[in-house]
Amino acid sequence: MHIAIVTAGGAGMFCGSCIHDNTWARALRDAGVEVSLIPLYTPIRVDEADQTSSPVFFGGINTFLEDRFSWWGRVPRFLTRWLDSPSIIRMVTQRAISTDARELGAMTVSMIEGEHGPHRRAGEELAQYITHLKPDIVCFSNALLCGTLRTLKQTYFGPVHCVLQGDDIFLDGLVEPYRSRAMAMLSQRAADFDGFMTHSHYYRDYMAAYLKLPVEKFRQLPLALDCAPHDGQPRDVCGDPPTIGYFARICPEKGLDRLVKAVLLVRERIPNVRLRAGGYLAAQHRSYLDDVTHAAAPLGDAFEYIGSPAEKQEKIEFLKSLDVFSVPTVYREPKGIYVLEAWSNGIPVVLPSHGAFPQLIESTGGGLLVAPESPEDLADALEKVLTDEVLRKNLAQLGHEGIRSKHNLQNLARATLALFDSTGTGPGTIMS
């Protein structure tokens, strides 16, 4: 069986969707499946072995120029191809390419326009490449890539599925009139996919309604993590000082400001508690971090932001320094890979009771759920975990064991193959 996975690069940042797509490709390869992981826009940035092996399609620089200058798409390809070089794109993404939805409305619309828009040539190149690969199944990593679908289906006759991993968050961040235009086109074009996958029941139901599609077209793909590098173990006793941790993108929707409010309440009861935070910080969110740092001023040296570690081992060492982990998101999280990372190192979690979190907690029992938007409830739960040694160790042990038994790479590969078999798109059932 040969599966082609088309994944969108994260413009130089560690992106949860990219990381899970990369993990997915590795899990399938380990199970004996042939996999082609195809990057779009930019090279992916991951903290494990990169599973991509193809050129970058829809290179971010050329895509930007095609969107800005109508004549750029008529420039001979041999004159523009060098701009799709991964090294060139990496150099530019360090300083120029934005992933802020507020700035990408026009480009989002033009990408969804597909064969009718300025990126028609790029779509044809991707379609030709995939058709030449002759995979049994194609999987796109988000619905915003649907502009290529009709061009692809002119030459490739196998099934094309889509993994939804937070598409609504980006779309809802678009400014008008681009959001309305993008949504209208997306609802129509998304229907061309043969099936959809989500990582939670919540997101399945939400996106079926959001895209106006029958829920019967949706299947669940479990989240998974390679636990081998994660050597943290559940602690017998709480650290001194007790440490609350956060590791996710630094942005308003992830809720670090909410965690600071809760920790300030915890500090009234546990005077030596500290808060350690880490994660990618985009330029547009530096002022947000400034506000968070100002709000955390009463904590003094007990608040620390470590930045975004360049190496996985640095992140693991950070996680191992924690006693409890929390990312109190404002939005409803569709995945939650950072939860798996905490569990893999023996850290219990406290999370808002919305999005994918209840299903994740149910799968292992490795944490507590609290009322969303309540710093008081969050503070009470954090204090409970830090002061009840039996509870803390029990939650840590359940999460540590649960991720290894239920969210491992072998289960991800088995679930993928079973999913395609159940939809009639297993090996040997299609021709391309």
Regions found by a protein language model. Give the residues of each.
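A conserved catalytic-core segment of Leloir-type glycosyltransferases
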Residues: 37-125
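Carbohydrate-associated surface elements
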Residues: 202, 224
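Conserved donor-binding/catalytic core segment of Leloir-type glycosyltransferases
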Residues: 236-254, 260-263, 276
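Glycosyltransferase donor-sugar binding loop
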Residues: 274-290, 305-308
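Nucleotide-activated donor-binding/catalytic signature segment of Leloir-type glycosyltransferases, i.e.
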Residues: 289-313
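Short hydrophobic beta-strand element within catalytic cores of glycosyltransferases
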Residues: 348-351
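Conserved acidic donor-binding segment of nucleotide-sugar-dependent glycosyltransferases
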Residues: 363, 368-375, 384-390
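A short, well-ordered alpha-helix in the C-terminal region of glycosyltransferases
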Residues: 377, 384, 391-405, 412-418
